[in-house]
A protein has these predicted regions:
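The substrate-binding groove and active-site-proximal loops of carbohydrate-active enzymes
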Residues: 20-32, 56-72, 109-124, 160-170, ...
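Aromatic-lined substrate-binding rim segments of carbohydrate-active enzymes
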Residues: 32-107, 164-191
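Active-site groove signature of glycoside hydrolases
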Residues: 48-56, 93-118, 126-165
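Glycoside hydrolase catalytic-domain groove-lining segments
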Residues: 168-172, 176, 185-271, 305
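N-terminal carbohydrate-binding accessory modules
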Residues: 1-49, 64, 79-83, 87, ...
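Conserved, mostly hydrophobic/aromatic
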Residues: 15, 42, 50, 81, ...
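Short, acidic/polar
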Residues: 27-43, 125-133, 198-211, 279-288
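Aromatic-rich peripheral "rim/lid" segments of glycoside hydrolase catalytic domains that contact
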Residues: 125, 284, 288, 292-432
Length: 432
């Protein structure tokens, strides 16, 4: 259930936790001393939370076997974070991380089942959510669950072995896991996350309406390697304000005008930015995002660089951390630490009187999601408005036809982009 943010609630700043030792494989044999060292460094940067990613294959190697030791390890990491004043959000279905899929053997090859629609697959995932909820629900620093990290990528046409879904099937899967989270950990706020195919890829079963209406908050994952940096430049207005763009785009599809939005994942990829550019990109991205209404917080991807001793990662994945492999904060991490104290206090957002119209069908799905993606006419209208000094908002065509709804949002002027310039979006949520 959505809970509105108190007016005086501080903005939250955190990191997606990538263990410095053995990356996510650390979950196979947890070293709490190493985890504590990592958390100590993050707390020194002034962060207040982390998002963690226990591996699905470690937690649930068989559909009816949820390993008690693995569940205990998740609780131990949550408790360790609390020692350093860090709250913790826990992703359940991993699922997918940094180009690697972690799928239990009971779901693929000889046991292939669509994870979103097969009754046994869904019931197994529900059981995992409930078990983790029972283990974590009384932890004072447990923020809640994300159903899984960008799990919609498993349904995308760009995936090598997709499990396709309709919008109704995607909604049923999200709801089943969120309901399990609410039952098992009712005191926390639970969300789901998608990579940007939900916003930009036509025909994708996960839609903007689902992203903006289900769960306690809308989560936004912003990556400029999706064509934004390639088309406009890594330090362009389009790239610096891409996260803000997605935040404002999500607001157009929310039925609750005060729905909180969490910039849950954003990073500075080396295939789009030079090392010298990354601190400035972080600051520009964060400053643009905090100018939006009802922002819960920002969780940077990621906490620690990946060790070069680990093979086969896309090159950009090795250097996304705020902290290097030597345990020292990198320039990008130091910049984050420098601006957090200034930005933590919530300030009034600028008025957004200019509304860019997103044409939708009877189900509130954009008639052209490609138009919303980098280089599309809706995206370009945003870039042009920002370049001209405006702070634009978005409205659906349904809202644009409702004078009372426009007045409630303070929108006095509309732009209707010509959708004939739409492009077919085919970006993946990783680069391999």
């Amino acid at each position: 259930m959505t809970a509105h943010l108190p007016a005086d609630a501080p903005l939250r700043f955190g990191a997606n936790y990538t263990p410095s030792t053995e990356w996510m494989h650390a979950w196979m044999s947890l070293d709490l001393d190493a985890v504590r060292r990592d958390f100590a460094g993050l707390a020194e940067l002034g962060l207040d939370h982390v998002r963690i990613f226990p591996l699905w294959t470690v937690l649930q190697p068989n559909r009816t076997l949820i390993r008690e030791r693995a569940v205990d390890d998740v609780r131990a990491v949550v408790d360790a974070a609390g020692e350093f004043g860090l709250d913790v959000s826990v992703d359940v279905i991993q699922g997918h991380l940094s180009s690697f899929d972690f799928i239990p053997s009971w779901l693929f090859t000889w046991h292939d089942k669509n994870m979103f629609t097969h009754p046994d697959a869904v019931s197994g995932q529900v059981a995992l959510v409930e078990r983790l909820g029972a283990a974590l629900g009384d932890a004072g620093n447990f923020l809640g669950f994300t159903t899984g990290n960008e799990t919609n990528q498993f349904s995308a046409k760009t995936h090598p072995s997709p499990w396709p879904v309709t919008e109704a099937e995607a909604a049923a899967w999200i709801t089943a896991l969120l309901d399990a989270a609410d039952r098992s950990a009712p005191a926390q706020q639970h969300v789901h996350s998608e990579y940007d195919a939900a916003w930009y890829m036509d025909g994708h079963g996960f839609t903007p309406a689902l992203a903006s209406r289900l769960g306690a908050m809308t989560t936004v994952h912003s990556w400029i390697f999706n064509g934004t940096a390639q088309r406009y430049g890594g330090r362009s207005v389009a790239s610096d304000r891409h996260a803000e763009y997605m935040i404002e785009l999500s607001r157009a599809f929310a039925t609750d005008p005060r729905r909180p939005i969490w910039l849950q994942e954003v990073g500075a990829p080396s295939n789009c930015l030079t090392p010298d550019e990354t601190p400035g990109f972080l600051e520009a991205t964060v400053r643009a995002a905090v100018r939006t209404d009802d922002l819960w917080g920002i969780t940077w991807w990621c906490s620690h660089d990946v060790s070069r001793e680990l093979a086969d990662f896309p090159e950009l994945e090795y250097t996304l951390g705020l902290v290097g492999q030597d345990g020292a904060a990198k320039p990008i991490g130091r910049r984050f630490a420098e601006i957090i104290p200034e930005l933590r206090e919530r300030r009034p957002a600028p008025a957004r009187t200019l509304g860019i119209v997103v044409e939708v069908d009877d189900d509130d799905t954009p008639v052209s999601r490609g138009a919303l993606g980098p280089g599309g006419p809706v995206f370009q209208a945003w870039v042009d408005a920002c370049t001209g000094g405006a702070d634009p908002a978005f409205v659906t065509s349904r809202t644009a036809a409702d004078p009372a709804a426009l007045a409630a949002r303070g929108i006095t002027e509309l732009i209707r982009p010509d959708l004939r310039g739409a492009v077919d979006y085919a970006s993946q949520n990783t680069v391999v």
